[in-house]
Amino acid sequence: VLTGLSRQQTFRRLLVAPHSLRSRFLELVDREIAHAAAGHHARIVLKLNAIVDVAVIEALYRASNAGVDIDLIVRGACSIQPGVPGVSERIRVRSIIGEFLEHSRIWSFENGGSREWYIGSADLMDRNLDRRVEAVVPVEDHDAGERLTEIVDLMLADERRSWQLRPDATWVRTEVV
């Protein structure tokens, strides 16, 4: 049983805050950096409600500078400045504002062509990573991974309800092509 009082701190597949979630996320980012350094296509896609954790943001900036393409779909608080030369040129941030607040968190790591998907409850905020019980699980079913690909691709292609974050921290409506 996973609760705030649980003694178990290691899990086989489950990434759990405050125990393993932060460290594993940072390992996954570092792995994408290694793939980029080896000349492989490297990409991270994150769909979440908030990203404000300093260590996570610094890791994503390092990844961007190493050649990793990063697409973020962030519903709420976002402390990343995308598109800043020499800092975050490969990071794109969009927000999709619809009728309903979305609660799904989806992570995707290209992993040298063997894409990995994760779903869970955690936003990338220090309170979620360090002071709450949150869980993220790898998606091991191929069909479920394909469905997540479809969902994220649709969200990244949305031109009706999406806004893009610019380097000057302003949001602009995505232009309909």
Where in the sequence are the language-model features?
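Metal-dependent catalytic core segments for phosphate chemistry
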Residues: 1-3, 13
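PLD/PLD-like phosphodiesterase catalytic module centered on the HKD motif
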Residues: 5-10, 18-177
